[in-house]
Amino acid sequence: MSLSGGPAVEAVVINWKRPRNVAKIVDALRRQSVRPTITIVDCHPDWRYRLPRFTLAKADRVYRQHRNLGSFNRYVPVGAYDHEFTYFADDDMLPGSRCIEHFLDTKPAEFGVLGQIGRRLNADGSYSRRGVVRTEQLEPVDFLIRGYFVPTQRLDCVNRLRWQLGLQQEPSVEDDMLLSVAMELIYGLKSFVTPAHNDPESKQNKVELRARHALAKRPDHFDRRVAFLRQAKAAGWSSSHGLGWPAEGQDQVPLRYHG
């Protein structure tokens, strides 16, 4: 439960340049079988991307800021997050109506981050976009993308590791990786993809939305992610299944995408 005795989960979504997507996501969150508190972090750069008033009225909480920190914007109001769990939703997908319920039903007693789209390093330690196959049980992963279900009281680790790695001045942090790495390095908590479920309403990406302005389309996107993983490794992090690390100059292994 929240500190005020309300819902156990706070669902957070960023509005930057996809207000139509955010409006749809807010509606999908309001239809959840287990209703979360809905929070919008509104950091749109100009009037073209502002949210309609009816969407803002449907949210329980709205935080407005003018400095863009990329996906790290979701962590700026972390001092105000006061529910037992926080679900961070990317703004390019719609969850099914039982998505929050699914996370609550499948969470282990101790965990750092839960999600449904996970990544592990390749066998040679290089970065891969290949998704971890979900099975009938929780599967450990190195990090998750696009949606993150976390124990709120542990979120302080994100900024702690950001300072330790010297990323406090970085305008766009690889925040998905930072979240999982911080949970493991600071609290010893693992990240998992949840068990596969044949109910489409349990999916965090039941419907895919337009993904214009996506950070993944940056020309240096994978170089930045590899660079972050090197920093994490230097800080003591290792892959969830003890993989090695590529030698210098071996990062450009051909990447394959499997959904």
Model-derived features: positions:
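Conserved catalytic core of nucleotide-sugar-dependent glycosyltransferases
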Residues: 78, 94-166
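A conserved acidic beta->alpha catalytic loop
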Residues: 42-51
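N-proximal low-complexity "stem/linker" segments adjacent to membrane-targeting elements
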Residues: 1-28
